[in-house]
Amino acid sequence: MKKNVIISLADSNYFELLNELIDSIKRFEESKNIAICILNAGLKNNEIESLSKKVDEIKDANWDIEVPKHKIGQKEWLKSQVSRAFIPNYFTGYEKYLWIDADAWVNSWEAIELYFKGCENKKLAIATSADRSYGRVLRAEWLFKSFATIKSQNYKHAKSSGFSEKIARQVALMPHLNIGVFSLENNAPHWKIWQKNLKQALNKGKIWGSEQIAMNVTIYVDNLPVEILPAYCNWTLINKLKYDQTKNTLVEYYLPNHEIGIVHLAGKNNDHIRYNKEYLSELETLDGNIIKKKLRFNS
């Protein structure tokens, strides 16, 4: 049995993106030693059959924490916000688990190695958007002279998810941890604490984003160990990339222009790319030229 596993989840709407993620992984020789397992949250039978030829295992995602039906509606894919906190229960026997959202793809295997290395010794390996390329991480509403109200994603989500004012303030100014890509060992203490915090978030707040604020609380309030990886290990700022034409790869915008590890097409700003594989994005090359290139994975 393979020791480590990469997991993702999709419904039928994200089937094509999931396929691209899998292909982006399997093109690397190193992937032969890594299992790939998929959680099904609304895939069609023919899609499951197609995926089964590429991956090690496919299982139906469940509502591992009970959620009121009015919060779910017809969005079964929201199971991704819950089931990722329980993946060792779905796919047992692995030493290390690496979750990658279906709307991401692997550009460099270095990122995979960093995630598996980073989670050793019972730590969470995860990236944050607090990076020089991303600009501001907080917003301020200026009230009078030097007085302002600080707007924080962590604070907002913590309050809307029912966490106390004390906890919301504890996480407010900390770098926001992006749970779209993360790695944990099977015996890491984070799983149980994360599940506890997730249950509280789901009880009071929306399903969307609940797993992310729950993990931020787990790290910054419960003080569980973390290895924060560079932003290029989960790059979501798709409009600020450069292209290295010599090496034929995407790189960070600023020097030393490190190769992007995982391209993550998350957020409304990237809808046009997620929903249109043929969309051409303008990219600056390392030579200062402007080229047009597709930013979906193309095998």
Model regions and ranges:
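Glycosyltransferase catalytic domains, chiefly GT-A lineage
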Residues: 1-299
